[in-house]
Amino acid sequence: MASPADSCIQFTRHASDVLLNLNRLRSRDILTDVVIIVNREQFRAHKTVLMACSGLFYSIFTDQLKCNLNVINLDPEINPEGFCILLDFMYTSRLNLRENNIMAVMATALYLQMEHVVDTCRRFVKSSEAEMVSAVKTPREEFLAGRMLNHPEVMAYRGRDVSENSMPLQNGSLCNGRAFAPGLFNSLPGSSISYPGYSPLPLNGFLVDDELREMRMPLSELSRVSAFPKERIPCDGSRTIPAEYMRTITDISANMCHATIYSPKEGAAEEARSDMHYSVASGPKPVVPSIRNNPYFSCDKVAKEEERTSSEDEISQHFEPTNTPLDRKGLISPQSPQKSDCQPNSPTESSSSKNARISQNSNSLFTKSPTDPKACNWKKYKFIVLNSLNQSTKQDSADQNEMGTLSPRTYMPMSTCQQSMEPEHLNVQSPTKMSVNGEDSNIPQASRLNNIVNRSRDGSPRSSEGQSPLYMHSSKCSSCGCQSPQHTEMCLHTSGSAFGEEMGETQSEYSDSSCENGAFFCNECDCRFSEEASLKRHSLQVHSDKPYKCDRCQASFRYKGNLASHKTVHTGEKPYRCNICGAQFNRPANLKTHTRIHSGEKPYKCETCGARFVQVAHLRAHVLIHTGEKPYPCEICGTRFRHLQTLKSHLRIHTGEKPYHCEKCNLHFRHKSQLRLHLRQKHGAITNTKVQYRISANEVPPELPKAC
């Protein structure tokens, strides 16, 4: 093991604690260095946080002429509520989305160039308005480069266009073009410096007229020309551009961030100084998606009800993309925050987990039922996801039992070799405890062997449709003649037997048998075996559910490996170590669960609210919140609890047990949280890595403590 000087310790909660402390500094107006004005409302923040979360603020504060600004006026028609929600998201990583503010938040996120928030808003719209998804299916690149995202001052050019200094702008196809924004940011009143910069967004959504008949047309008029481009042009140059194409531009903001209104006179003067063909907005327009003009956000419920059933498939096929979306990485300018390490990626909850990425990129969100048994993990989701299927399955099984038949799915043969064929035995449950809903909650190894026998019998010619499923009881082992269906798979003479060496070692209490003429008989079911090892395997699998017992706590296990893993609890051995933080565990499964803390993976999802969890046990506990079930009652006072651990903690009130001990002052506590609070208050100990500021709003500390 490495020495403490060579080890690297990672605090998993450090990032969230720093963000929490920054939010508290903002709420107390400590070290805030910029004021954002949105529609006469002021928001104080830190420049570092703003530029780390927003591409717009990154482009502003990285410029040497603009980095010292202390007051920034955004577009007056930007919704202050949407900006407030995004500002809180920057400091808390929690996005408060509701149906009444989703459009404002999305428009503001587009304005601030927070693409991961835009993607989240789009998924929120798809989940809440399922009919919108079937109306228009737009690829991500086309949506981001479409009508709502482009800068107000758009220059449409071709390869032969030349700027003022006779330098060619760009040679290539139109799909590789970029928008040029001469007025991306205007400084405060008193500063007349114009800041030219390239937009990081491609213009693959614009199709320019080859004769440039509309180059001088105002953007407000161009937005009424057409709702969609007539045809998309592939970037490979294999197709020729027709003579006439219409371009679609919506009413967008005249300035990305400004203190003074950009007037048409200034635009005319700017146009007169340049030979390039670009259009100037006639006035300030908000970066708000137009509900009427944008069919993606069309919310006319009357029209949707009339057209939803008839033309749903036609619309989805009509707007299907004809070519592969462009790679926008090659079009990003040097000033784009996406080429900097400070540009934020998507939140960990939505990008790190492979399950989350699959759900985000998949278009079959509503085509597959969340309760599809094939999509569920039977061992982990059987109690949570299949609750709705249990009732219907039980009802079907009850109907079959009334007819005197056994379902092939629910059938399980008895463990004895000689089973009576009387009708009363047909409905007797076997020791395997196979439930009628298909759940294998308490199935021993013998039951799994029976399933193998069932599958092999179904494929044999002797198993016909009219044959009773109890046929296998009359089958005999070809090697030793035993009639037990379990023995057929366990006998060493049978070909294809795949039992490990550890299954041959059993305790003496399961080997009670009688030996006669070299043959071994089982005293439980009178099965005959040629070797003693076969008899031991038979006793282990058929007549014992959990033969391996711990000699310290009497815990029993089905497999020897589980017993060996259990003994590490008593010995304190933790051979499995995390390579990132050095934490050690006694089981590999615990190490696997721990590594999800570092990777951010949350594979278990609640089908009701969409919350994700690291462990399936956390998901099971969370599901009880929706069902309202409290299955754990206190036998003394009758109080019911949702979780078993809460009940165990409650029982200490009645028993008086105080298992948590303070080594410094010899005090005992009933709960672990009480001991932690005592250590913090009385002994000044830091019980975890979460450091919080304990100062009043009016008090400004001379030096901030360091977060661990």
From Swiss-Prot:
Pfam families registered for this protein in UniProt: BTB, zf-C2H2
Record keyword Repressor present: yes
UniProt feature, compositional bias: Basic and acidic residues: 303-317
SMART domains per the UniProt record, alphabetical: BTB, ZnF_C2H2
Cellular-component GO terms for this entry: nucleoplasm; nucleus
InterPro entries: BTB/POZ_dom (IPR000210), SKP1/BTB/POZ_sf (IPR011333), Znf_C2H2_sf (IPR036236), Znf_C2H2_type (IPR013087)
Polar residues biased stretches: 333-370, 431-454
Entry keywords, A to Z: Activator, DNA-binding, Immunity, Inflammatory response, Metal-binding, Nucleus, Repeat, Repressor, Transcription, Transcription regulation, Zinc, Zinc-finger
Main location as per UniProt: nucleus
Domain of life: Eukaryota
PANTHER family on file: B-CELL LYMPHOMA 6 PROTEIN ISOFORM X1 (PTHR24394:SF36), ZINC FINGER PROTEIN (PTHR24394)
Function: Transcriptional repressor mainly required for germinal center (GC) formation and antibody affinity maturation which has different mechanisms of action specific to the lineage and biological functions. Forms complexes with different corepressors and histone deacetylases to repress the transcriptional expression of different subsets of target genes. Represses its target genes by binding directly to the DNA sequence 5'-TTCCTAGAA-3' (BCL6-binding site) or indirectly by repressing the transcriptional activity of transcription factors.
Protein name according to UniProt: B-cell lymphoma 6 protein homolog
Species whose genome carries this gene: Gallus gallus (Chicken)
Lineage, highest ranks first: Eukaryota, Metazoa, Chordata, Craniata, Vertebrata
Gene responsible for this protein: BCL6
